[in-house]
Structure formats: structure tokens, C-alpha cells
């Protein structure tokens, strides 16, 4: 089979499209013929050897896939349409996947959209509904609202009845956030966002901040919290892991909440989150934002675009 293999921890330049043996499923796994695979910022970190999951080179990256089960397993039968998360190995024609990490893909959900589901949508749903306990009528600030997980969180917050603000880098990304329902969008390329946000909330701040960026953004986000506010720590796409000033949380009676899940510890919650997301999609309340579709052979170009912040929503590569 063909697969994109990383020979050394250095980045996408170390990727090569090679002919490699198909993986052999272990007990509890099935082989999936990949029809689409989604890109994540964590793929870039894994290629550089700085992600918390560090496979030994040579390895095949890729953590979100959708496709067709190639052989019968304990839970899945040959021909089933599925999507799921893998630790790595997704940028290949076939991948062995733990059966409990797959979910059935409805017939009306294209493989490209299915590949965009397994990571960002449960993350956004769990952050807002399980960790922050978001209620209708509350105010939410979504950082990087045009990105993959940001655009998911923006839509889920709107669907929950919240008033949503967003930050975005550039006018095109800001326009997308407005299209998705943000009440106001702050273009981070045009100046600071904290003061305008505080004006729009009459100095109160927001009930929830969804932060996948980290660094200085997190420090400013603590200042943006209202009393009893919740800061959701989703990731560090900006590259810097922040130190949160606990005295500011204390004075606002606020909380900083980490957002991390796994199938080993949170399987029922993840299953519930995915069911809720698919129901919202079926009702027309959200869109699974696949904004960039690339041929499998163009994976390297797609990763460069992601690294250079030239993408909105999700990027996927497709296979015949």
C-alpha cells in the first residue's frame, strides 16, 4: 500500500510517499481502507518530535480517518462505513484501528466530513458542555474561531444559545466567524482584542473563554473572564505554554479547566459527544467545516498551508 512515512523527527520535509506493507490488525483491531484523512496541528508537532505521543521513526502520521472496514472484527463487519481516531498511521491507504475507537458514519455524511469529526468535535463539545457546563444566554469568547477546533466550538456555543465572540487572524477568517454566527469578531492582526471585548460586555467580561492558542493569549483571557468565569485550556497552537496568574482567578472566583480526553478513560462521554454533534448536523444547526480538500499525493503541501496559518476549518486529504 502507499503511505506517507516520516523518516526522522524534523517536519513535513522528512515525509516521503512510499510503498509499504499493509498493517496487520492485532486483537481488538480491524483494518480500514482510508477514504479521507484529516490534518491536525498535532500532526505538525508529532512530525517534529515534540508532541506528547512520540512514535519511533520511521512512522506514518495522521490521527483522523474515515473509510470502509476491510475485514470482519468483533464489533465491525466488512464494508461498514466508519470514522475514528488513531494514534498515528492515518495518512495511508489502509490503517489498523482499535475497534472501540471507531464510530459508524451515517450514509449522508461524506467521508471528507467524517474524517473531520473524531478529534475536534468531541474536544469542542466536551470543553463547552462537560467542562464549562455552558448555559443558554451566557457569553463565550472563542480564540482562533476560524480554525478547526475553533470553528467547531463557535458553532456549538451558538447552538447552545450562547452569545459568542471570536478572535481571528485576518479579514477572511474574521468574515468566516461572522458567517458562523459570532456577535463580534476581533481581528488579531489589526490590534488588541481585550479592550474592545470589555466595552461590548459593559466591562463585565465573558462567562467562558475557549483557548486553543496559549501564550500571551491565555494571560489576556484571564483578564477577560467575568466573575465565576471559566477558562478552557484546549491547546497551545501559538507554541508557548503559559503560566496562569492564580491571583486573578481567585479575585474573580474563576476557574481554569484543562480539556483532554481519551477513549481509554472517557469512551462513554466521547460517544455521547459524537452523537450530539451528528444530531446537530442532521438538524442543520452546525456545519462540519471541511474547507480544504487535497489529493493524497499533496499531503506535504497541505501540511505547509496548515503550519503557515493559511487554512480555515478543517483540511483533509482524499483517497479513491
Locations of the language-model features?
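Short helix-loop-beta connector
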Residues: 107-110, 133-139, 203-204
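Glycine-rich phosphate-binding loop and adjacent beta-alpha segment
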Residues: 216-286, 319-320
Amino acid at each position: 500500500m502507499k503511505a506517507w512515512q516520516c523518516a526522522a523527527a524534523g517536519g513535513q520535509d522528512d515525509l516521503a510517499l512510499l510503498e509499504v506493507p499493509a498493517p496487520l490488525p492485532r486483537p481488538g483491531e480491524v483494518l480500514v481502507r482510508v477514504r479521507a484523512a484529516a490534518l491536525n496541528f498535532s500532526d505538525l508537532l508529532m512530525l517534529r518530535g515534540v508532541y506528547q505521543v512520540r512514535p519511533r521513526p520511521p512512522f506514518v502520521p495522521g490521527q483522523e480517518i474515515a473509510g470502509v472496514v476491510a475485514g470482519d472484527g468483533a464489533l465491525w463487519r466488512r464494508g461498514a462505513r466508519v470514522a475514528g481516531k488513531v494514534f498515528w498511521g492515518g495518512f495511508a491507504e489502509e490503517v489498523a484501528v482499535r475497534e472501540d475507537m471507531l464510530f459508524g458514519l451515517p450514509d449522508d455524511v461524506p467521508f471528507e466530513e467524517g474524517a473531520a469529526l473524531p478529534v475536534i468535535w468531541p474536544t469542542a463539545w466536551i470543553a463547552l458542555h462537560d467542562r464549562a457546563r455552558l448555559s443558554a444566554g451566557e457569553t463565550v469568547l472563542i480564540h482562533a474561531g476560524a480554525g478547526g477546533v475553533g470553528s467547531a466550538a463557535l458553532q456549538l456555543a451558538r447552538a447552545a444559545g450562547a452569545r459568542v465572540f471570536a478572535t481571528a487572524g485576518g479579514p477572511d477568517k474574521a468574515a468566516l466567524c461572522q458567517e458562523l454566527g459570532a456577535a463580534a469578531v476581533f481581528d488579531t492582526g489589526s490590534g488588541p482584542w481585550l479592550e474592545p471585548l470589555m466595552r461590548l460586555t459593559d466591562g463585565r467580561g465573558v462567562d467562558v473563554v475557549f483557548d486553543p492558542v496559549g501564550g500571551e493569549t491565555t494571560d489576556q483571557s484571564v483578564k477577560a473572564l467575568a466573575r465565576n468565569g471559566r477558562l478552557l485550556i484546549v491547546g497551545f497552537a501559538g507554541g508557548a505554554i503559559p503560566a496562569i496568574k492564580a491571583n486573578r482567578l481567585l479575585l474573580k472566583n474563576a476557574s481554569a479547566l484543562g480539556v483532554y480526553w481519551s477513549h481509554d478513560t472517557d469512551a462513554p462521554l466521547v460517544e455521547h459527544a459524537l452523537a450530539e454533534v451528528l444530531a446537530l448536523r442532521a438538524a442543520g444547526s452546525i456545519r462540519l467545516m471541511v474547507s480544504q480538500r487535497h489529493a493524497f499525493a499533496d499531503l506535504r503541501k497541505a501540511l505547509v498551508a496548515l503550519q503557515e496559518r493559511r487554512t480555515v476549518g478543517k483540511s483533509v486529504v482524499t483517497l479513491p
